[in-house]
């Protein structure tokens, strides 16, 4: 199940949240293997060569599905999921050096969900969709769950101390190296990062709710795929496709948001 939402409810355009559950088909890229699962239970696996492109595979997979209805206001069907940074080598001519990976999650995962709930928070209304393949409509069951009493919230607590894959000194050396390459003209920008890990006990969705309450970023997401969960936030949309046009919004401190869409556009 996944949750896509916005905390920027000041205008109608940014007021839609999506809840998707009951995946009936999916496409996954992990360890050079592209796996596809279809609603009829059939599956297919393709062993990829180094840097083999997957865009056409993804496009062909998505084109197999269509719905009987379309909404101009909401995304009522389609594939929902994520593409990690490391997947870029299967879309562009970029070669990564081999590294020991201790986070075993797919580089890319998209699913076709049987149920999609589009919530217009601005108007306080919800639209429920069911995509059925040789199965009966389950909207009555979904409505029953929504009308049930609110579930119990669970606690969240840290266990032990946080740790990182880099020490402070090691990270400082990386920054110096990045500055050196900028001065040389090899690159105009380098985004450096380090990973922090924190053991915990409790419900990670509680942590997401805390992030949502304190983070000013308008776009937030929570993905629960059973074996792993991914959640976070973004200051702005990186790619927007609307009315047949695609807009790219670089994310690197290039655009200051005021909270007022009209003022931001000016």
Model-derived regions: residue spans:
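Extended alpha-helical targeting/anchoring segments
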Residues: 1-266
């Amino acid at each position: 199940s996944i949750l896509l939402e916005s905390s920027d409810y000041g205008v109608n355009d940014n007021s839609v949240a999506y809840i998707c559950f009951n995946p009936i088909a999916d496409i996954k890229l992990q360890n050079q293997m592209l796996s596809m699962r279809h609603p009829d239970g059939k599956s297919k696996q393709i062993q990829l060569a180094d840097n083999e492109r997957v865009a056409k595979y993804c496009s062909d997979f998505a084109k197999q599905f269509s719905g009987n209805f379309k909404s101009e206001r909401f995304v009522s069907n389609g594939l929902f999921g994520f593409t990690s940074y490391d997947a870029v080598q299967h879309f562009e001519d970029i070669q990564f050096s081999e590294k020991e990976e201790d986070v075993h999650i797919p580089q890319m995962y998209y699913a076709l969900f049987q149920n999609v709930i589009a919530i217009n928070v601005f108007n306080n209304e919800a639209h429920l969709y069911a995509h059925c393949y040789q199965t009966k409509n389950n909207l009555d069951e979904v409505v029953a769950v929504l009308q049930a009493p609110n579930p119990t919230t669970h606690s969240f607590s840290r266990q032990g101390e946080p740790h990182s894959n880099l020490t402070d000194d090691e990270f400082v050396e990386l920054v110096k190296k990045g500055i050196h390459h900028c001065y040389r003209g090899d690159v105009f920008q380098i985004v450096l990062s380090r990973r922090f890990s924190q053991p915990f006990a409790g419900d990670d969705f509680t942590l997401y709710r805390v992030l949502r309450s304190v983070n000013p970023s308008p776009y937030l997401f929570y993905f629960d795929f059973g074996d792993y969960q991914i959640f976070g936030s973004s200051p702005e949309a990186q790619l927007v496709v609307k009315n047949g046009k695609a807009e790219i919004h670089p994310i690197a401190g290039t655009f200051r948001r005021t909270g007022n869409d009209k003022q931001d556009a000016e």
